[in-house]
Amino acid sequence: MQKFTFFVSCAKGIELLLKDELERLGISSQEKLAGVEFEGSIKDAYKVCIYSYLASQVMLKVATDKVINQQDLYEFISSINWMDYFAVDKTFKIIISGKHYDFNNTMFVSQKTKDAIVDQFRNVTNQRPNIDTENPDNVIKLHLHKQFVNVFLCLNIDSLHKRSYRQFQGQAPLKESLAAAILIKAGWLEELKKHQPILIDPMCGSGTILIEAALMAKNIAPVLLNKEFKIFNSKFHNKELWDNLLEIAKNSQKVTNAIICGFDIDNNVLDKAQRNIYQAGVEDVVTVKRQDIRDLENEFESEGLIVTNPPYGERLYGDQLDELLDIFNGFGDRLSQDFYGWKVAVLTSFADSIKEMQLRTTKRNKFYNGAIETILYQFEINEHAKFKHETQLEKNIRIAEASVQKSDEHIDFANKLKKNLKSLKPWLKQTGLECYRLYDADIPTFAVAVDVYGEHIFLQEYRADATIDQNIAKQRFYQAIYQIHKTLDIKYENIHTRVRQRQKGKEQYQKENDKNKFHIINEFDAKFYVNFDDYLDTGIFLDHRKIRQLVAKAAKNKTLLNLFSYTCTASVHAALKGAKTTSVDMSNTYLEWGKNNFELNKLDIKKHSFIQADCISWLKTNKDKFDVIFLDPPTFSNSKRMDDILDIQRDHELLINLAMDSLKKDGILYFSNNYRRFKMSPQILEKFNCENIDKICLSRDFLSNKNIHNCWEIKYKK
């Protein structure tokens, strides 16, 4: 029997499964990209067309050559004796795949190929074969790769994955061949060797997985379901052989005692599944019923296999994403509680849903559902399956303990902590402070800031430079956690971490979660609430300690306007010295925090004003005059509550002028910002008495970072 070279195409990711499938048909093949290649007879190729659950196209290899221009292409196609492949009265169509270095237009390649074939027939027979793009007798495929053109003659006119049973489908249909692939990968063929195989799809949708499982259980050749299947009408086609093989396939079907069950919460989808099941002729094996996956019960006498392809997160669920995650959390609970000994496979592109199951995966395999990359996650439900949820604290401890085994650089960091603490101790004893900066990127390789808040540490990681390996930066961060715990004798749970970098859009100044854990700290004669876990900052800026004291001293028994007041810490210090304060901030959250700070210090909030407003807009309409104003704007802000974006370098002149309009003639404006390259407006310097007080406002614990802020005392000229 004459031998040919055939290429059998398939979806990316299932090449090895296809190779194994051909082995079961007695065909030895080689794995290629998106398919396999084998040497064999037309009979072998027919067997693949009839029995393969995984193949897309079976193609006879005609020729391959290097082609660098359109003349080369025409001559190459003309060199093939097309009359050996099909008669002039047979129609054909051309399909193109791949990419070629010299041909950007596949329409051109198709046209040139057609011209070469038609010209050859016309020159020999004075007739030409016709093109039929809808229902051709033969399909010629050109696959382009770099400068090579591979020519194939397709045995199956339409794709083999089409089974014709899927008349009704849901929103996100799974290709029949991919459903078959994940069943095989999940172990359905092995399950079929049991006395009573069991398969469940708890989110069955329109039933594709169930039907493919039933076809395998009943040994139904997929081609028998494709009512529109058409084999090529080539001179190589052996109709008698083809018909005999089809008859053998029909007679090879068997009765099975397999139990195949599908569940879904949507009655409309279940109705589609039921109709597809009848269309496929497997209603004697497959049953479906309505049930929430979170209520899944094991009503079976032995262990089996669960295979499902749930909706892919946001693609289908959108605003109901939380509901999807809850579904998977419940699914994981049902599996671990009621399906001991079962095997489970879940195909999804949405990893968060898998995490919610809290089960250990035993295997992960990549598949493609069309262009969508998906992962098949497999589980074995046993005593080791349930994955204990690891808290962030437990994760930090585990990684921190492991990180110090990888290098010794952390020893230098530990020594620096000890040295800094020893240096600060006399000053801390003198001031009685319990909150201070202990370390600020003193060693470049440990780019962190360590702030002490009594028994707590606020550890801020500066964004690593682009030239620094991100894995090394992360390793050093965890080494810092370990050494803070060990060197400073701080409990791991009291080490609170944050990455310091410019925030974008919704990342700016929003709560990260709802932990709401507040702690009380002392600063001189004041007490404040701080929060280490829920906000980007703790509620107090330690580097502003001295300017808060200056403001409070100047405002003693006077009026204070605190602009961009944050949590009103400067207002509290001033109020404790008898000042009547007005605090203005856009954030109601921080103003409420500020009120709590007042009450913590036994200050009557009714005697003070707290105003939620855009400071610039408020200043433009304010008529009151104040003895002291503290103006401490952010470097940059694009809050939706503001009328415009705030850029401190650009806008400080406007801000200062507006603030001075609210200042009494003998008053003081304290202006502060944290922009390191800040330059005071020459017009402001000319218009008012301005004194830079950076050095006065720099505390002992911030001496290593002298550019941390810009502080100015501004008065009217006499």
Curated annotation (Swiss-Prot):
Main location: cytoplasm
Top EC group: transferase
UniProt keyword annotation of Cytoplasm present: yes
EC number: 2.1.1.173, 2.1.1.264
UniProt-annotated location(s): Cytoplasm
Keywords noted in UniProt: Cytoplasm, Methyltransferase, RNA-binding, rRNA processing, S-adenosyl-L-methionine, Transferase
Pfam families per record: Methyltrans_SAM (PF10672), RlmL_1st (PF22020), THUMP (PF02926), UPF0020 (PF01170)
Catalysed reactions, semicolon-separated: guanosine(2445) in 23S rRNA + S-adenosyl-L-methionine = N(2)-methylguanosine(2445) in 23S rRNA + S-adenosyl-L-homocysteine + H(+); guanosine(2069) in 23S rRNA + S-adenosyl-L-methionine = N(2)-methylguanosine(2069) in 23S rRNA + S-adenosyl-L-homocysteine + H(+)
Cross-referenced CDD domains: AdoMet_MTases, THUMP_AdoMetMT
Paired cysteines (S-S): none
GO cellular component: cytoplasm
Domain of life: Bacteria
Domain THUMP: 44-155
GO molecular function, one term: RNA binding
Protein role: Specifically methylates the guanine in position 2445 (m2G2445) and the guanine in position 2069 (m7G2069) of 23S rRNA.
NCBIfam families registered for this protein in UniProt: PRK11783.1
UniProt family annotation: Belongs to the methyltransferase superfamily. RlmKL family.
PANTHER family listed in its UniProt record: RIBOSOMAL RNA LARGE SUBUNIT METHYLTRANSFERASE K/L, RIBOSOMAL RNA LARGE SUBUNIT METHYLTRANSFERASE K_L
HAMAP family found in the cross-reference section: 23SrRNA_methyltr_KL
Protein name: Ribosomal RNA large subunit methyltransferase K/L
